[in-house]
């Protein structure tokens, strides 16, 4: 089995070319003051670059590793509407002005993603047949019934499904019901992020790959971005690093708890997988330690859960865990071989809401996506471009904020890591 070589299965199977390896990328840093420098080459950074360049701003992305190297390339690939919180909790947290606006924009989030895919002909295996939030227990179904009622009251296309209906969509009788969200779908996330890079480059944005940002300094009316390849001057800087935020800006990463999420993919299963998720919906469940499940375009099955990869051999904990989950869901499937495994990071905030921080004059960071990176990164990239072209910050989907340390964030990360490892060990061995 191949482990994170170097990113995920998605990198191997993406049909969208990487423009930074095809002779199209400008690796040099501009020697003039530009409008916006963007640190990070994932969904957020490239959406920001695309929308800024399309609006006539000179934008340049600086990425230390490779396009999609962080959470964007390690994503499950579920293009979901909304966030983890149900609509009532969002209204309660954001109030009567921001709450409805946030819900409207995030309800439309999948449409924004699929519109970009269509407009720029991004090759990312886009499938829009919905996603399934599956009840792991009767308590999970009760929570889904409440969530369903709230979305239906807003006129959104979601269906509450009984156990038999979920079995028909998944090929498994293991679930206690579910919520089918017709707004949503699935993609190859590396294909999508590469497509954003191609579109941003075509719109005039610059890309510097393999360049590490070392520091930020305010210099008169602009920022000096210090890198290991020289300095770049920009009137505005957007930090687009989310769960991969380092110590570049003091205290920024202290506002979120970082957890890990792993995935493991089977070999090609061919016709053996035809009756499993025949509509190719992606699925995740209501369990406290979440489990996700989907198929790729080549009929591989992808199993995911919270935590890191534990062992890469056939007797490794993660393979045992995944094998037992598959046996429980599809006892007739028989034994399968696993081909690829990887894990990535998720940035969790205390209230499960994302943030748009203004760190200083002309310095912004969208951050804290709580596992909803595809839609949030895409939407917040558009929001950054809107801000930089004159939109009133009051028109954002949530208030501009400043970083605040999340109490015990580092300790929580370690505790979660231990709990997720224990979950894998217990379910993999017993």
Regions from the PLM with identified roles:
Residues 74-105:
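Glycine-rich active-site loop/strand segments that organize a redox cofactor
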Residues 93-199:
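Rossmann-like flavin
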Residues 111, 119-127, 213-215, 231-271, ...:
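Active-site substrate-recognition segment that forms the wall
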Residues 150, 178-235:
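Helical element adjacent to the flavin cofactor pocket in flavoenzyme catalytic cores
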Residues 36-61:
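N-terminal Rossmann-like FAD-binding beta1-loop-alpha1 element of flavoenzymes
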Residues 54-74:
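Glycine-rich FAD pyrophosphate-binding loop
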Residues 1-36:
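Extreme N-terminal leader/targeting segments of oxidoreductases
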Residues 308-315, 319-428:
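C-terminal catalytic lobe of FAD-dependent flavoproteins
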């Amino acid at each position: 089995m191949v482990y994170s070589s170097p990113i995920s299965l998605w990198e191997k199977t993406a049909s969208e070319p990487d423009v930074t390896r095809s002779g199209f990328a400008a690796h040099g840093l501009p020697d003039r003051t530009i409008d916006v420098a963007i640190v990070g080459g994932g969904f957020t950074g490239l959406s920001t670059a695309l929308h800024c360049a399309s609006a006539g701003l000179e934008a340049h992305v600086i990425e230390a590793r490779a396009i999609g190297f962080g959470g964007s390339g390690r994503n499950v690939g579920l293009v979901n509407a909304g966030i983890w919180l149900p609509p009532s909790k969002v209204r309660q947290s954001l109030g009567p002005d921001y709450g409805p606006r946030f819900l409207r924009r995030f309800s439309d989030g999948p449409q924004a993603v699929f519109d970009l895919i269509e407009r720029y002909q991004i090759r990312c295996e886009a499938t829009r047949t919905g996603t399934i939030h599956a009840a792991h227990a009767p308590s999970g179904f009760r929570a889904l019934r409440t969530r369903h009622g709230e979305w239906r009251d807003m006129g959104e296309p979601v269906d509450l499904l009984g156990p038999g209906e979920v079995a028909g969509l998944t090929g498994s009788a293991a679930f206690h019901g579910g919520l089918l969200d017709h707004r949503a779908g699935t993609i190859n996330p590396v294909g999508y992020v590469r497509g954003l890079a191609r579109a941003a480059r075509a719109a005039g944005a610059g890309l510097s790959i393999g360049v590490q940002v070392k520091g930020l300094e305010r210099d008169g009316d602009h920022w000096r971005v210090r890198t290991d390849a020289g300095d770049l001057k920009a009137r505005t800087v957007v930090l687009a690093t989310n769960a991969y935020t380092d110590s570049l800006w003091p205290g920024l990463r202290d506002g979120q708890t970082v957890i890990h999420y792993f995935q493991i993919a089977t070999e090609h299963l061919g016709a053996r997988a035809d009756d499993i998720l025949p509509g190719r919906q992606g699925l995740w469940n209501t369990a406290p330690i979440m489990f996700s499940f989907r198929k790729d375009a080549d009929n591989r099955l992808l199993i995911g859960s919270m935590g890191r990869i534990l062992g890469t051999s056939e007797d490794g904990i993660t393979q045992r865990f995944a094998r037992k989950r598959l046996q429980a869901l599809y006892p007739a499937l028989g034994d399968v071989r696993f081909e690829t495994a990887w894990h990535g990071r998720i940035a969790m905030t205390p209230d499960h809401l994302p943030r748009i921080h203004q760190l200083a004059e002309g310095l912004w960071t969208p951050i804290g996506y709580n596992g909803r990176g595809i839609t949030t990164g895409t939407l917040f990239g558009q929001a950054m471009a809107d801000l930089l072209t004159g939109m009133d910050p009051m028109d954002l989907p949530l208030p501009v904020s400043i970083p605040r340390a999340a109490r015990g964030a580092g300790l929580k990360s370690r505790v979660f890591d231990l709990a997720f490892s224990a979950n894998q060990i217990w379910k993999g061995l017993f």
